[in-house]
């Protein structure tokens, strides 16, 4: 049996699992600067209340090439229904119109899915989606302690463009954030 990774627009049935993933990072890490868990309603707003060219995707694992007995076993296995591995967002970088060709990237995975290459595949996918939506620049802002995300963005050509010192406080410690950016679109009038 093989599995494939799919990126599909987030749907209502994904929201509960997505809020669980996000709230793990809220409660146990400095990856998120929220200090209180989000409610389902708050997460729905983040996922669905987006201007048209911003979007959210669920990262889904699907099983392939099953024989009939395996298909029956999978269909009755409640664990299979939980095939959502994480989610990706393209959101507004800033709320002013001149920023409309720039998007901020967010990638969250279930904690047990880190280090498996899923984040890399998600980043490649979201860059392609961003190009199709006409974005020129992608920005990723992460806690400076989040070295795995920093390595991911650097590996894919993102350049550090900002470092803000001690702008957050969580778990009784001051936290820095760093921003990375990547030009993905053509510059009208410059690139032809």
In which residue ranges do the predicted regions lie?
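Conserved GNAT acetyl-CoA-binding A-motif
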Residues: 130-142
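Conserved catalytic-core motifs of GNAT/GCN5-like acyltransferases
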Residues: 89-92, 97, 139-142, 154, ...
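Conserved beta-strand-loop-alpha-helix junction that forms the acyl-donor binding cleft
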Residues: 114, 140-150
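Conserved acetyl-CoA-binding loop-helix of GNAT-fold acetyltransferases
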Residues: 108-109, 115-132, 150-155
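Acetyl-CoA-dependent GNAT
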Residues: 35-112, 123, 183-185
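Helix-loop element at the rim of GNAT/NAT acetyltransferase active sites that forms part
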Residues: 20-37, 49-50
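A short beta-loop-alpha structural element at the N-terminal edge
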Residues: 5-18
């Amino acid at each position: 049996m093989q599995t494939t990774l799919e990126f599909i627009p987030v749907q209502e049935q994904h929201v509960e699992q997505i809020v669980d993933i996000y709230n793990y990072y809220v409660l146990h890490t400095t990856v998120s600067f929220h200090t209180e868990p989000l409610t389902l309603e708050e997460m729905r707003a983040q996922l669905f209340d987006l201007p048209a060219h911003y979007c959210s995707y669920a990262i889904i694992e699907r099983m392939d090439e099953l024989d009939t007995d395996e298909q029956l076993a999978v269909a009755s296995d409640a664990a299979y229904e939980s095939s959502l591995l994480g989610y990706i967002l393209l959101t507004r970088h800033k709320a002013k119109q001149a920023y409309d060709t720039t998007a901020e990237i967010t990638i969250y995975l279930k904690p047990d899915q880190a280090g498996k290459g899923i984040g890399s595949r998600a980043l490649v996918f979201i860059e392609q989606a961003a190009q199709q939506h006409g974005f020129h620049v992608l920005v990723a802002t992460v806690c400076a302690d989040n070295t795995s995300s920093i390595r991911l963005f650097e590996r894919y050509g993102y350049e550090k463009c900002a470092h803000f010192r001690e702008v957050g406080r969580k778990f009784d410690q001051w936290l820095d954030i760093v921003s990375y950016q990547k030009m993905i679109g053509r510059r009208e009038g410059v690139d032809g």
